[in-house]
Amino acid sequence: QLKKEAEMAEPQGSNGIAISGDLTKSGNAMLLINPHTSFYFRGEVHVVSEEGLNAYGAVTWGQFFVYQGFNEKTGWMHTSTYTDVMDEFKETIVKNDGKLFYQYGEELRPVDSTTVTLKYKDGEAMKEKTFPMYRTHHGPITHQVDDQWTASAMMWEPVKALEQSYIRTKQDGYEGFRNMMDIRTNSSNNTVYADAEGNIAYFHGNFVPKRDTSFDYSEPVDGSNPQTDWKGLHTVDENILVLNPE
């Protein structure tokens, strides 16, 4: 029974292989797209428009762009990346005159707060619960570590991420594809690439924060110390990028 359950476990990760035209019989570059997902997780679609969109590949529920696939000139696929794209900041909370602040260097900054109302079903009745949400400049308060409120920092540019995913499907060569990667909102994936000109490439991650390496970001860091803050993002060229390896 345990063996059967293990065989039915959800797949993890994916495989992608780009082969240079120098190594193929046809002389064309080849791209293997092998996402390890459950059977119904992604459907295959052909997206065509009169304005020139012409892409085929896999989409996840609700996506209007081809997540991994190809158009007439380029092909792209993604594997799950182990690049560190998320950190936790322990905040020092101070309450003054009924208002919440957090320590940041020598200053006290106000904690941002909003309220959220969620509706839920209780038997046949619909009920709702309203509760506060808090955040600092590091990100939303998501949990406590050592009895300290802890903010989770991550890529949160949903519109830019959507733009990058759509723009990716319209590129006709490496130059445009490489420029698209400069948007740097693909936070969870590596990218394997091939095109009709014979180019192949591998991009390890895309959204990679710059950090002070004197701190251990594998654990929550002290959010009151400005030195722990992210210092922007690494450029695509600063990350691992392999183009046409010999």
Outline where the language-model segments fall.
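Mature extracytoplasmic enzyme cores
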Residues: Q1-E246
